């Protein structure tokens, strides 16, 4: 069964002092505001409103914890970088994100959401800089890839992979589309590997030929 399906909400917190006890491996999802993080989570969980999708970027101000059937925890971090958010709120988010990414002992990996049309912004790089020193893996989802042509998507994927290779060997990158459900199997297999779970029950990752035949 897909790892993220049947995710159940547990708690939301606004301050690092309110973090719940570390019970189970945590996989964090982070991304710039309006990069498609909430849509990606909802698509992976097969749930229309598990993660709140706001029409106003930057409105998600909490860290939200969701328990998975395998016992691990999906952690939805606040979107970052939206200019209209007041400066004091931005500073609060930055402190909360940095504390969580640097200090949370049961955080085993980060799924970093980037808009495929605008990848590796300075704030994306800041997130990587916070997380890389711990040696834990980062998996980048280049979202909204359905808005690019096939050649543009392939070129973007290759370019981002080249750039992150210099930032740390533990960073992997893939294309993803919530709308077209592109890349779901690849994320599942990646996170299953982090958790040490068998991937036998997960859907197979489509081959390039299968994707072309399906019009993706």
UniProtKB/Swiss-Prot annotation:
Binding site for GTP: 31-38, 58-62, 76-79, 143-146, 176-178
GO CC field: cytosol
Keyword Nucleotide-binding: yes
GO BP annotations listed: division septum assembly
Cofactor: Mg(2+)
Family annotation (PANTHER family): ENGB-TYPE G DOMAIN-CONTAINING PROTEIN, MSS1/TRME-RELATED GTP-BINDING PROTEIN
Protein family (similarity comment): Belongs to the TRAFAC class TrmE-Era-EngA-EngB-Septin-like GTPase superfamily. EngB GTPase family.
Name of the protein in question: Probable GTP-binding protein EngB
Gene (UniProt): engB
């Amino acid at each position: 069964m897909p790892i993220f399906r049947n995710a159940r909400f547990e708690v939301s917190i606004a301050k690092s002092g309110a973090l719940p006890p570390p019970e189970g491996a945590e996989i964090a999802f982070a991304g710039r505001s309006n990069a498609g993080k909430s849509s990606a989570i909802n698509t992976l969980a097969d749930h229309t409103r598990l993660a709140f999708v706001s029409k106003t970027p930057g409105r998600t101000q909490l860290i939200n914890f969701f328990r998975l059937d395998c016992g691990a925890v999906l952690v939805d971090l606040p979107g970052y970088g939206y200019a209209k958010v007041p400066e004091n709120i931005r500073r609060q988010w930055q402190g909360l994100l940095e504390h969580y990414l640097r200090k949370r002992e049961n955080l085993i990996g980060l799924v970093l959401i980037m808009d495929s049309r605008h990848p590796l912004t300075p704030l994306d790089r800041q997130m990587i800089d916070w997380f890389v020193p711990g040696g834990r893996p980062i998996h980048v989802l280049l979202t909204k890839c359905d808005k690019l042509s096939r050649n543009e998507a392939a070129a973007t994927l290759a370019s981002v992979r080249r750039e992150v290779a210099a930032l740390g060997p533990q960073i992997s990158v893939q294309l993803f589309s919530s709308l077209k459900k592109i890349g779901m199997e690849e994320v599942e297999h990646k996170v299953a590997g982090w958790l040490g779970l068998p991937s036998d029950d997960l859907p197979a990752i489509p081959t390039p030929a299968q994707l072309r035949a399906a019009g993706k």
